[in-house]
């Protein structure tokens, strides 16, 4: 499919109108939100998938992604994997840290695919 107007830049998630006869995009509806990395638009939720260990949770990457999501009013779901590789105490300390520092601003789902926990 081609874009009729060179000034239109279509990205994943865009709602478009197109001419079926000419097989071209004729317009792009106003985006409700969009992210630069990855380039997406009209996002209802964003799921962030991080492991708690191996590799360890990268708080800097997480904060950058969270800030981008909040700037665009996109609700966040955080999935924490590999919880079977840490003790219950370590997991609880980590979850308490997230909840206290981020004031319960997103949903957290701890999972373990190895032990079939949270799936």
Region spans (language model):
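Histidine-anchored nucleotide/phosphate-binding helix
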Residues: 60-73
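N-terminal accessory targeting/assembly segments
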Residues: 1-59
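Residues at alpha-helix caps and immediate loop-helix transition turns in enzyme cores, especially N-
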Residues: 58-61, 90-91
């Amino acid at each position: 499919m081609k874009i009729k107007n060179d000034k239109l830049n279509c990205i994943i998630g865009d709602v478009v109108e197109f001419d079926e006869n000419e097989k071209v995009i004729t317009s792009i509806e106003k985006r409700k939100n969009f992210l630069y990395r990855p380039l997406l638009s009209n996002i209802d939720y964003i799921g962030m998938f991080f492991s708690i260990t191996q590799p360890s949770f990268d708080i800097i990457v997480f904060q950058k992604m969270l800030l981008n999501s909040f700037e665009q009013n996109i609700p966040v779901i955080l999935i924490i994997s590999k919880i079977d590789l840490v003790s219950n105490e370590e997991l609880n300390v980590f979850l308490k840290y997230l909840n206290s520092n981020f004031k319960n601003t997103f949903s957290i789902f701890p999972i373990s695919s190895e032990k079939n926990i949270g799936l």
